[in-house]
């Protein structure tokens, strides 16, 4: 018989599977292009004629190119081979206008060898900005001495305080170029809209050809590579890299660039957009496809775990066999981790689930301590419920475990905080405080899970653990291991993902060691409920 709860879960899983199948179909439509089947209305590739080409890169402060005397040639590749990969670093002169928060443009021409680009009717070109505007990243200093080793901080101190919050010109030190090299014959009646805007057609006799498709990979421009342009800067390095690209990958890359641009138009910051760029640029397409499925299932398991966890705690009235200290610690550590990720401006893919988890942990503390809120006018009054004899027995085991842990934990946390204050630079005292807390959580947080393990050991049972929610969270633990290598996140948060694997294995061992026993508790704070004694039968 289907219950309302199981029907809702089945509906969510069903919608999720439909979404995954639909997304796979859409992705297939992006990377696959139907070739021209007949002779009429076909558009042939100009590269199939094997013309001798030349690549030229110019810089100018003007957004539109008027005459050749307004540009500076920074790179000239004669006898350019579209199949040969290369990378070259050149020094670019920075005009005074650009040093004063102006913009510098790069014009990239692909034209016939031996002919100037503006004299070649069969040339193709693209334009890219070499500068962008961003608020400078706050400099980290030694909080005790106030020392900072960078010249950027010295110049920043000379500026008025309100000027530090204003966007300034930053240099993009990388320019990544691609040419689509597939000898693909397009159907003129069904040109893909994404590629069409990059195509330039010419008529050669009775045949229509499309010129080489030149593409700038904007996803390779990362925030971490940007350099502040100072007024004293006269030259800056620019790395120009080239590689061929297939039609399927080109179409996929165009869609990804458009998606990132759309997110920025909807209010996503440059930092959040940069995290998405990192996923695309730093991984190959096969790992990227795996990432999509991993992310989709991570969201599904997050939802199911939150739903199961909330449902279990909503019905909970007893804390027998459950470590209250572990619940309080999980709440504290989850909130600290959320504040830390917020301070580090971590990707929203990591930040939002952490925020939801922190809210749930706060609610679980209210249930664990049996807190009720009564209002006397505008003043809230907090009342705590009473504990049964069995709950007091659990608290005894809990306090015993915490006593031994405190001898080890507190000196380690205090020592780590003092060491980081003396040797590591931070943006502010708040940043140091949050980092000290979160490093304690990440490095020694697993110790706070020991009281629950100790309670399980003393009571010789884990049967009351909500294994459904626990299983969902365990799946996400292994998924987090994959994300630890893909999504940009603080190193300490990355290491904590692998620490959770150890905790999961310990609980599996306890489940095997203490088979079915309905008088035990779980790692997430769930425990069995005390069953009221039934009255004896009259007979």
Swiss-Prot record:
Keyword Transmembrane annotated: yes
Residue stretches in coiled coil: none
Domain of life: Eukaryota
MF terms (GO), sorted A to Z: phospholipid scramblase activity
Protein keywords: Apoptosis, Endoplasmic reticulum, Glycoprotein, Lipid transport, Membrane, Transmembrane, Transmembrane helix, Transport
The protein's name in its UniProt record: Lipid scramblase CLPTM1L
Keyword Cell division: no
GO biological process: apoptotic process
Subcellular location: Endoplasmic reticulum membrane
Catalytic activity: a 6-(alpha-D-glucosaminyl)-1-(1,2-diacyl-sn-glycero-3-phospho)-1D-myo-inositol(in) = a 6-(alpha-D-glucosaminyl)-1-(1,2-diacyl-sn-glycero-3-phospho)-1D-myo-inositol(out); 6-(alpha-D-glucosaminyl)-(1-octadecanoyl,2-(9Z)-octadecenoyl-sn-glycero-3-phospho)-1D-myo-inositol(in) = 6-(alpha-D-glucosaminyl)-(1-octadecanoyl,2-(9Z)-octadecenoyl-sn-glycero-3-phospho)-1D-myo-inositol(out); a 1,2-diacyl-sn-glycero-3-phospho-(1D-myo-inositol)(in) = a 1,2-diacyl-sn-glycero-3-phospho-(1D-myo-inositol)(out); a 1,2-diacyl-sn-glycero-3-phosphocholine(in) = a 1,2-diacyl-sn-glycero-3-phosphocholine(out)
UniProt-annotated glycosylation sites, renumbered to this chain: 91, 101
Stretches in topological domain Cytoplasmic: 1-10, 307-325, 425-429
Function: Scramblase that mediates the translocation of glucosaminylphosphatidylinositol (alpha-D-GlcN-(1-6)-(1,2-diacyl-sn-glycero-3-phospho)-1D-myo-inositol, GlcN-PI) across the endoplasmic reticulum (ER) membrane, from the cytosolic leaflet to the luminal leaflet of the ER membrane, where it participates in the biosynthesis of glycosylphosphatidylinositol (GPI). GPI is a lipid glycoconjugate involved in post-translational modification of proteins.
Topology class, membrane: Multi-pass membrane protein
GO cellular component, one term: endoplasmic reticulum membrane
Segments on the Extracellular face: 32-285, 343-403, 451-539
Transmembrane segments: 11-31, 286-306, 326-342, 404-424, 430-450
Protein family membership: Belongs to the CLPTM1 family.
Main location group: endoplasmic reticulum
């Amino acid at each position: 018989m289907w219950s309302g709860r199981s029907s809702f879960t089945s509906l969510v899983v069903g919608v999720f599977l439909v979404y995954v199948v639909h997304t796979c179909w859409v992705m297939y439509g992006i990377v696959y292009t139907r070739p021209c089947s007949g002779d009429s209305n076909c558009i042939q590739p100009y590269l199939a004629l094997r013309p001798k080409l030349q690549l030229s890169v110019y810089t100018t402060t003007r957004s539109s190119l008027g005459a050749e005397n307004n540009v500076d040639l920074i790179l000239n590749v004669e006898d350019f081979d579209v199949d040969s990969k290369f990378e070259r670093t050149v020094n670019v002169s920075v005009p005074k206008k650009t040093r004063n928060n102006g913009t510098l443009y790069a014009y990239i021409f692909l034209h016939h060898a031996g002919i100037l680009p503006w004299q070649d009717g069969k040339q193709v070109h693209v334009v890219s900005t070499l500068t962008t505007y961003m608020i400078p990243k706050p400099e980290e200093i030694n909080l005790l001495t106030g020392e900072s080793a960078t010249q950027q901080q010295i110049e920043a101190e000379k500026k008025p305080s309100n000027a530090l919050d204003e966007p300034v010109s930053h240099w993009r030190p990388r320019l990544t170029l691609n040419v689509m090299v597939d000898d693909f014959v397009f159907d003129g009646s069904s040109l893909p809209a994404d590629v069409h805007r990059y195509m330039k057609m010419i008529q050669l006799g009775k045949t229509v050809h499309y010129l080489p498709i030149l593409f700038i990979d904007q996803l390779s421009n990362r925030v971490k590579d940007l350099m502040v342009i100072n007024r004293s800067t006269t030259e800056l390095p620019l790395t120009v890299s080239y590689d061929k690209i297939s039609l399927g990958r080109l179409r996929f890359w165009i869609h990804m660039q458009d998606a990132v641009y759309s997110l920025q138009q909807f209010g996503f910051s440059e930092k959040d957009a940069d995290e998405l760029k990192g996923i695309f640029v730093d991984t190959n397409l096969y790992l990227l496809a795996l990432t999509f499925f991993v992310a989709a299932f991570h969201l599904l398991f997050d939802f199911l775990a939150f739903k199961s966890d909330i449902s279990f705690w909503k019905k909970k009235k007893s804390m027998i066999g459950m470590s209250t200290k572990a619940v309080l610690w999980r709440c504290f550590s989850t909130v600290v981790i959320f504040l830390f990720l917020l301070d580090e401006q971590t990707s929203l893919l990591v930040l939002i689930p952490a925020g939801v988890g922190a809210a749930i942990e706060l609610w679980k503390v209210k249930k664990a301590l049996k807190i009720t809120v009564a209002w006397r006018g505008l003043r809230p009054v907090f009342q705590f419920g009473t504990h049964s004899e069995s709950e007091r027995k659990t608290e005894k085991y809990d306090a015993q475990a915490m006593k031994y842990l405190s001898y080890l934990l507190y000196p380690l946390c205090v020592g780590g905080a003092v060491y980081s204050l003396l040797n590591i630079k931070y943006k502010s005292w708040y940043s140091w405080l949050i980092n000290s807390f979160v490093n304690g959580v990440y490095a020694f947080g697993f110790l706070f899970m020991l009281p629950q393990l100790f309670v399980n050991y003393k009571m010789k049972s884990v049967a009351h653990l909500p294994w459904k929610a626990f299983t969902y969270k365990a799946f996400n633990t292994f998924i987090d291991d994959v994300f630890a290598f893909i999504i940009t996140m603080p190193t300490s948060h990355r290491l904590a993902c692998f620490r959770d694997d150890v905790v999961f294995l310990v609980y599996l061992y306890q489940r095997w060691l203490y088979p079915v026993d309905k008088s035990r508790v779980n790692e997430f704070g769930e425990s069995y409920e005390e069953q009221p004694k039934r009255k004896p039968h009259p007979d």
